[in-house]
């Protein structure tokens, strides 16, 4: 009898844990980290592919992506909304992918915002902060200081909320 009750308690506990940890495909899964807060990404000014003198927005989004990354593909529409409908500059950084794949992805998705495709340039930028995978999105202020680091797929509303 005691063994049966103990087994039922354990089984109930395992089911409870499984239910709490279950996620649906539509569920947003990302984390906001403060690990990089306050780090200046000054190396962006050294890049030939981006002219920072022309950026007049209060915030800059750096989005680390690859063409083969499903969450990166999913968030393209959200990044397009941010770049077109808000006063936020979006810059993509190609990671762990070829330049030709990156160019094809940009063309296929009609991405108008700037992207850093060359590995030499992206390595210079990526060495300045901590990141663990893609997609990773960083919110910078106009002085290129990191305010937020988001690991995982993002939404436009989430970014807008964090930049209020």
Residue ranges and their predicted role:
Residues 1-43, 164:
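N-terminal targeting signals for export/organelle localization
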Residues 76, 80, 99-106, 126, ...:
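Extracytoplasmic/secreted envelope proteins and their assembly/folding machinery
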């Amino acid at each position: 009898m005691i063994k049966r009750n103990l087994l039922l308690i354990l089984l109930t506990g395992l089911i409870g844990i499984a239910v709490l940890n279950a996620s649906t495909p539509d569920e947003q899964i990302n984390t906001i980290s403060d690990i990089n807060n306050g780090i200046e990404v000054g190396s962006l000014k050294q890049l030939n592919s981006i002219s920072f003198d022309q950026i007049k927005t209060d915030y800059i989004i750096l989005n680390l992506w690859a063409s083969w990354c499903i969450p990166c593909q999913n968030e393209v529409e959200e990044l397009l909304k941010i770049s077109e409908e808000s006063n936020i500059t979006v810059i993509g950084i190609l990671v762990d992918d070829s330049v030709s794949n990156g160019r094809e992805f940009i063309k296929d998705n009609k991405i108008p915002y700037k992207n850093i495709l060359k590995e030499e340039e992206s390595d210079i930028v990526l060495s300045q902060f901590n990141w663990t995978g893609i997609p990773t999105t960083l919110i910078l202020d106009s002085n290129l200081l990191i305010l937020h680091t988001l690991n995982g797929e993002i939404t436009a509303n989430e970014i807008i909320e964090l930049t209020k």
